[in-house]
């Protein structure tokens, strides 16, 4: 499919996940996709070889990594981003009383502060394109399950 001239950056595009599926869907619709992964070995092979797809290494917990991703997208798009999909996230399944506080902080950093940091960093490109943001969430907010209390409080 020819390019629409629109771009999307999706965090958390490791093989087999929702992000990889979203990246493939956007690519098929004609978007230039910036599919991000922390570990390049986990990038889906079908995306690595697809036209209009750029695999970016991005650790959403690192300000330096986020800044490097902004620079890469800016150079490739002329300073525009049409869609940002904050998809990175994680949960911990265990009783709250067994949760290590440091692990809980890391979970909260990943699920709350990281999407906010990515949004703030890409905001100028989104504003320039009159773009939009999609923040991936979970059914866990509506469907209580045992041993997910720490996940429920991290947006």
Where are these regions (language model features)?
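Residue(s) in the substrate-gating loop at a strand-loop-helix junction
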Residues: 138
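Substrate-binding pocket helix/loop in short-chain dehydrogenase/reductase
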Residues: 95-96, 103-107, 130
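Hydrophobic positions on the long internal alpha-helix
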Residues: 66-69, 85, 118-122, 126, ...
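Rossmann-fold cofactor-recognition segment
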Residues: 49-64
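Conserved NAD(P)H cofactor-binding loop of Rossmann-fold oxidoreductase domains
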Residues: 87-92
